[in-house]
Amino acid sequence: MGVREGGESMKWIDMTLAEFQLALASSEPTPGGGTAAAIALGQATSLTMMVTSLTILNTKWADGHEAAHKAEEVCNELYLRTGDLAQLDSEAFEQVMKSFQMPKTTEDEIKKRKNTIRKSMLNAAEIPFQTAELGMKLLNCLEELAIRGNGNAVSDVGVAALLASAAVKGALFNVEINLQSLPIDTGVGMRSNIDKIRLDCSKVSRSVMHAVHERIHQ
């Protein structure tokens, strides 16, 4: 949760850009990379929505309407979700820090603290994993939009893809660092998919970049 000058608490997504950047630059533990990744995905989503609108509202780009509608459907799912993930990521990390501050004098306290730490760190991995999955969902609809969408906005598709790719790979870093401290049999589903998501991200991103360059220089 961010705090404005004067002590007002508010969500990251409700801050001005200047306020959020100031919070991100501070020495406070949150917001951090996971929140920044979710915000980047939100920016990628917004850029994509702009391109879909510019495509759908112009009959000149009728050949791209289907691709635009598909991308728009994905964006409608992501638009509000990315802001939630940005907030949840910070809250999850704050919970991790609180769990480490739990008392550890008695055996019961030690056991409770250990279980709480594991639970909070697993949650701190699950949040950015969702960001990565949603980032791939957006990336997967951008190549067709670059090929068939409004040609005047194809560079914006490229920027959206770069932001989405950064969001995916950045989120995966946060997944890995939180899973690293947990037993190997914890978060198995995430562990088994990290490399595949990262590889798919690179592959799809390159395809989108190629499509953007081809469209610009055709």
Segments from the language model and where they lie:
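Conserved phosphate/anionic-ligand binding catalytic regions in large, soluble enzymes, centered on
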Residues: S26-M49, N152-A171
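Amphipathic alpha-helical coiled-coil segments
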Residues: A71, C75-T82, P128, G135, ...
